[in-house]
Amino acid sequence: HILYTLLFIWLLPVTSNGQPAGKEKLRVISYNIWNGFEHDASRRANFINWIKGQQPDILAMTELVGFTEKDLGQLASEYGHKYYAIVKEEGYPVGITSNEPITVVKKQMEGFWHGMLHVKTHGLDMIVTHLSPHDWKFRLKEAQMLTSYIQDNQLDNCMVMGDFNAYSPIDADWVETHAQLIENMQKWDAEQE
């Protein structure tokens, strides 16, 4: 429940776009590229074409497997973003690109499964993370760390994005009808105890 609360609470301030009245709305996308596109050129090309069509102002990405900061910059340039940041260059990095300058506020690995990246762009604080895929108790600790970080730093105009490895209430009916998924989730939790 804390994950949903966390997302809901910090999305509210940006529903008004976080910008002065009269400005256009901000277009933001959070996207999991699934294991660095698995080195599949056609998946990468399809992603770039789709992103070009969406024209986001800000794009957060998870699972930037195999990406360096330079690689992320190259990808960003292919859909028109000049600014980018990545939390790390090994494992399963998270990153963000923007059509406006980015200021990196914090890159944190400690306490996070894949890391937490905090940047400022478009006048907003943007946090990108990828929570534990295996252990709900660890995810809960990560969510609590995010909540504390946001409160301690008084981030009033903040958006948290990424892969929370949690199902939305919208998915509940689907999850309940797929026994194998439920079995897998229970198995993963048991393996972590």
What positions do the PLM features span?
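Sec-dependent N-terminal signal peptides
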Residues: 2-12
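N-terminal, active-site-proximal structural segment of metallo-dependent hydrolase catalytic domains
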Residues: 4, 16-75
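Active-site environment of divalent metal-dependent phosphoester hydrolases
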Residues: 36-38, 66-70, 134-136, 165-172
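Structured beta-strand-rich core segments of catalytic domains in phosphoester-bond hydrolases
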Residues: 62-135
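Metal-dependent phosphoesterases centered on the DNase I-like endonuclease/exonuclease/phosphatase
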Residues: 144-193
